[in-house]
Amino acid sequence: MVNQGQPQPNLYDKHINMFPPARARESSHKLGNANSDRHGLPAQNIVPAPYPVDDSIVELTPAIPFTSPSSSSSLSLPLSALNFTDGNADGGQLGTPVTINSNNGMDIFNSKPTGEIGYANNGTNSTGSRYELPFNFSSTKESLGSPAVQDASISSGNRISESVRDNSAPPPYEESESRILQEKVYRTEEKAPIRPLNNNPVPPQKINQPPTGSAKTDDNGSSGGEDKLSSYSPEALAFYQVYKKTITDSSKFTPEIQMQWCETLLTYAFNEDFISQYNINAEKLKRSLKPEEMLKNQKVILEHSFKVLTKLITLKWPPAMYLMGTLYSHQPYLPIKNKNIVIKNDEKALEYYCKAAKLNNSDACYRAGVCFEYQRGTSSLDPSPTKEQCIKKAFQYYQHGAEVCSNSACMYKLGMSHLYGLNMQKTDVLLAIKWFDKAAQKGDSPQTLYELGKIYEFSVLPPEIQNLLFANGIRKDSQLAIKYYQQCAKDFEYPLAQWKLGNCYEFGDLGLPVVAKKSIYWYSKAAAAQPKGNPMAMLSLSGWYLTGAPNILKPNNKEAFNWALKSSKCSDGKLARTEFALGFYYEKGVGCEVDLDLAKQYYQRAARMGFRKAVDALRSLTN
């Protein structure tokens, strides 16, 4: 397959706008098999958030799909047939291929708060009495998909200071005294007797949690006790373990334990299988709940999660502030299906990120930096900062996150800033490589590995960057570039690196041999990546279907057209080569009916992006 047209700027070469995901939570915070969103194509329009959506890292099981969504035809070989004669298997066992030819001041972090954050008291000053056990709340029916929690204390139009304030607004959930009075005691060993007519005092009943091994049944038909755990689902068992740990910690209110409980509640509130079978007390119900009962159960769980989160924020627990920021930005790190539990507010998201960053939360440093870099949530700051001031703040947050908090995402951003220059930031290629190396050593930054691969591939970088690298003694090293690409593609399932390996095996770049099976394999991995796949890999599969590969893949025009169409949808029509390919297919009737009007439309899209072949094709159609 031959490249068409003159070399064009590659939208993916300089991926400074692509950011690493939030760091993985500690293993103790992993919540069983909680379901997460999976988005298919076509790509949905998502409201811009304070930081870009990242590339998900998802294990591709079962095997890679070799058909486009709109067709039932498939490759002429199963995935199991992709075993290579050289003894390597790219499906996880492929070794590193062998080539053929051998600031400013940090004043925003130095000041300290002078008092407590002025959040709502929530009915008590105790850390134990209100949080000893989960509560049951009376609730009204709400849509299962939209249990919105409002914050009426501060409007989004109010101007705020970007620094940490002692009297900032409370989180979205704020309970009233009447709500507190409505709460029910968790459990008693037996129901309290009716008061006698003679008004003689009755000794109070002792309130206990269920003894280990008990299997009591309450009025709602729920049953608990460890003798019933054998019937629990794996997800419910994971919930029960967190619940049990939380109950044990109720008198201490240890932030780490309570934070895990809060995250668990937020996650499980949107797990329909769980909320239809279990309640907040980790008890399995005798029957599945009806939809309206599930709504009530969901609201109970959500309300309590915000009670715990509010309490943690009043204690100035940085992860809680960071979590609140992610909820306000509608980009939570938790697998929350409905992000509208909190009204989107970029200004308040930035405020919470800054609070958490000031307390050295590494993820908050990164997100605060991104917010300032792209001026998300900065319009309400007083005074309103200029673009240059925002860039300066962003660099400060990245620097703090990298140097103080050892955050690999911040190291990556510093590397990109020094390599390409962040607005007015001076380029320093050696310092960029230093930060990339540090991030790579932490083992959780695939973007860094990809950038290092590009640096040692050399020719894909802008000429001015190549000159700077050459002047500092950095030369092209194909073997080192392949090593970084291979590690990034295998260890992190990073779609760009997978596409790159497919491209190298297709055209024999970086000293690799032309191997059709390996090329198709890596393209397929990248095209099937979550959340929406890589559009360049989809276009490359279109090319393989158009030409075929002897003894590997039969030509299939329909599949060629479908993969090109999928690439266009995935890239939102912003990949010039894809738009040109669709114009060609419609003009020639490859895998579709001839449609010259559509052909012109696609050619025009590609031409507007500077694709020379499209300009020539338009002239040919009009003559």
Curated annotation (Swiss-Prot):
* InterPro entries in the cross-refs: Chitin_Synth_Reg, Sel1-like, TPR-like_helical_dom_sf
User: What Gene3D superfamilies does this protein's entry cite?
Assistant: Tetratricopeptide repeat domain
Specify whether Cytoplasm is a keyword of the entry: no
- Give UniProt keywords alphabetically: Isopeptide bond, Repeat, Ubl conjugation
Question: Which SMART domains does the record cross-reference, listed alphabetically?
Answer: SEL1
GO BP terms? fungal-type cell wall organization; positive regulation of signal transduction
Tell me the superkingdom of the source: Eukaryota
Compositional bias, Polar residues, is annotated for 152-161, 206-215
Basic and acidic residues composition bias: which ranges? 176-193
**Sel1-like repeats: which residues?**
318-361, 408-444, 495-531, 576-611
Give the start-end ranges of region Disordered: 141-230
Looking up PANTHER family in the UniProt record yields:
ACTIVATOR OF C KINASE PROTEIN 1, PROTEIN SKT5-RELATED
Miscellaneous notes: Present with 98 molecules/cell in log phase SD medium.
Task: Report the protein name in the record.
Answer: Activator of C kinase protein 1
To which species is this protein native? Saccharomyces cerevisiae (strain ATCC 204508 / S288c) (Baker's yeast)
